[in-house]
């Protein structure tokens, strides 16, 4: 197969496995519905400076990530594809960066392609590519900043060096506008020790100032605009989203320091079996500048994230591109040496995982069925397991010829697994589909009420209105609700009957509840018994008609 055929096949695979599935499943709560609603509000309301969630101030992130998701909805429509396309584009650009950096480091087309393919099929990267979240975008900007740094350091002319440092500053600025100060910290963590090791600290001071200047020019217009609009933004964003999350005793998502070590291996599936040989080779080649640069890029951000109290799996996504390059470099070396041990081990690992998944599914179906009268979804999940097993078997039996078989396993997984979810998961985690089924009943509602932020944002996004009142819940909107002008946007349990009586005098009221506990059932019991009710799994929609005063 020549190069043109290879790239054509990869483009077809990209469309089939990454783009087609985007519209095949509802928005997951809480992240996808939140980001869809915030960006839609920007698109409809025209406020591109101050982020608002359900019409309330929401200062947990800057604005660039919302801009990109809003752009997707503006171009492709306010639909599932439009909401998710920004993540796919960001992932595709990161894959391209993996290819370009590997080509620059080793100047070998085969190694470049292997590195890009490994990165594109890492489970965490591929899985997040079809998920409307800010992490794929932020990961791209961090990747771009460090790729630009290497290009600047490896430049053969002053003009190329200036271009590299300028691009680094642009990437840091956009990363900051996407997720905050980490976009500045992570490149510094890598650049400082590497350039000190290379005795190029004068270059760091001189050209680094250019990168800082460019980053400030990118950030300052919005930073000043949001400060003028919302004077409390920077206090909340800096202390709540950075200091408390990193060092606070009450940090969200608190995990032990070693949380990311096993997760790193899981994130690399279906290539995790290559990790030992890749890390061993990196250790032997640690004195080579390209390998040292990649090792610092992998290890120092990983150490920083491990020291943070608040941890989520997606935080380590910026560490995966250098890992893919180290693994791809080691993989091609094994292929050239006809050394099949690591490849056989990886194939055996994937085969074992597939058999384990099949056994677990069979056990659950016999004891407590996950799929109940859902033959198509069960067939899809069996197809995913079968593809994973076939890929593992092929790589185990024919390691040198079928070295790329895990690509199929990963891509079939991301293409089919969302559609293979059992109904109980779909009903619980994607309420926008339930809302879409009842748009006719909801369109005329004067007031909207919900006891769950995920359900409320799904309701707001589907109806293109953010005025959903919160029923006995506050969650991450606690800050926005603290402003006096928004105090009526949340109704405590004790006041619900009085609130409903007043609201129904204005017009009909639509209430969307997620019933997951006894307290949720009590919330449902407090609603009036008249009107229409619709139920789907743990979702209940009550449409209460207008009453006369």
Swiss-Prot record:
Keyword Cell membrane attached: yes
Membrane-spanning intervals of the chain: 9-29, 80-100, 112-132, 136-156, 176-196, 204-224, 256-276, 288-308, 312-332, 346-366, 376-396, 402-422
Bilayer topology: Multi-pass membrane protein
InterPro entries in alphabetical order: ArnT_tfrase, Glyco_trans_39/83, LipidA_mod_glycosyltrf_83
Localization per Swiss-Prot or TrEMBL: Cell inner membrane
EC number(s) reported in the record: 2.4.2.43
Protein family (similarity comment): Belongs to the glycosyltransferase 83 family.
Cited PANTHER family: MANNOSYLTRANSFERASE YKCB-RELATED, UNDECAPRENYL PHOSPHATE-ALPHA-4-AMINO-4-DEOXY-L-ARABINOSE ARABINOSYL TRANSFERASE
HAMAP family assigned to the protein according to its UniProt record, in alphabetical order: ArnT_transfer
Functional description taken from the UniProt entry: Catalyzes the transfer of the L-Ara4N moiety of the glycolipid undecaprenyl phosphate-alpha-L-Ara4N to lipid A. The modified arabinose is attached to lipid A and is required for resistance to polymyxin and cationic antimicrobial peptides.
Species classification: Bacteria, Pseudomonadati, Pseudomonadota, Gammaproteobacteria, Pseudomonadales
Any one Pfam family match given in the protein's UniProt record, by short name: PMT
Name of the protein: Undecaprenyl phosphate-alpha-4-amino-4-deoxy-L-arabinose arabinosyl transferase
Recorded GO CC terms: plasma membrane
Record key words, sorted: Cell inner membrane, Cell membrane, Glycosyltransferase, Lipid A biosynthesis, Lipid biosynthesis, Lipid metabolism, Lipopolysaccharide biosynthesis, Membrane, Transferase, Transmembrane, Transmembrane helix
Pathway(s) of this molecule: Lipopolysaccharide metabolism; 4-amino-4-deoxy-beta-L-arabinose-lipid A biosynthesis
GO terms for MF: 4-amino-4-deoxy-L-arabinose transferase activity; mannosyltransferase activity
NCBIfam families recorded: PRK13279.1
Catalytic activity, as annotated: 4-amino-4-deoxy-alpha-L-arabinopyranosyl di-trans,octa-cis-undecaprenyl phosphate + lipid IVA = lipid IIA + di-trans,octa-cis-undecaprenyl phosphate
Gene Ontology biological-process entries: lipid A biosynthetic process; lipopolysaccharide biosynthetic process; protein O-linked glycosylation; response to iron(III) ion
